[in-house]
Regions:
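Short, well-ordered amphipathic alpha-helices
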Residues: 17-26, 45-46, 74, 124-125
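CheY-like receiver
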Residues: 47-51, 55-132
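Extreme N-terminus of proteins, especially the signal/transit-peptide cleavage junction
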Residues: 1-4, 136-138
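Conserved SAM-binding loop
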Residues: 8, 38, 88-89
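A generic structural motif
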Residues: 27-36, 54, 84
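Conserved acidic segment of CheY-like receiver
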Residues: 2-23, 59
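Conserved Asp/Asn-Gly motif in the active-site loop of CheY-like receiver
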Residues: 36-44
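Conserved binding/recognition cores within well-folded domains
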Residues: 120-156
Length: 156
């Protein structure tokens, strides 16, 4: 299984700590190798993503932050890539519609409970693994025309 790269961005350290703890519990429970990087500001996250979009598979993003809000951060990320999975985590339910405007996978309301984060993380991990397997298969196999048929050949 692919190592999963996750970013957690929230301006409140207490929420970052809780989410990271839950992700670590999930990682141990399902024996999945997960690397987590944390950010306290949307601009900081966006700067890192602009340098290397492939850096993250999943981003947990607070909506209400002082420098640049989570929705604008997500819009900036979407200008660079449609592939990264974005999950909003916030105290403000009123932003839910905007969250889906940037094709977020989920919208989790604070205070975050493990069962809800586990549900969302499970969906996200399946999507990441599927995309990884699909890309790996595209790189491993080629279609070769044979007479009136096509054969799939393993090139490794």
């Amino acid at each position: 299984m692919k190592k999963i790269e996750i970013a957690v961005c929230d301006d409140e350290q207490i929420y970052i700590d809780r989410i990271v703890k839950y992700i670590e519990v999930y990682s141990e429970e399902y024996e999945i190798d997960i690397n987590i990087k944390t950010y306290n500001a949307g601009r900081e996250l966006l700067d890192d993503v602009e340098k290397d979009i492939s850096k993250f598979d999943i981003i947990f993003l607070d909506v209400e932050m002082p420098d640049i809000d989570g929705v604008d951060t997500a819009r900036g990320i979407r200008k660079i890539s449609d592939d990264v999975i974005i999950c909003f985590i916030t105290s403000f339910e009123r932003y839910a519609i905007a969250a889906y405007g940037v094709e977020a996978l989920a919208y989790v309301v604070k205070p975050v409970v493990y069962a809800e984060l586990k549900r969302v993380l499970s969906r996200a991990v399946v999507m990441v693994q599927y995309a990884f397997d699909h890309k790996e298969a595209e790189e491993r196999y080629i279609e070769v025309p044979v007479a009136k048929d096509t054969r799939i050949v393993d090139i490794r």
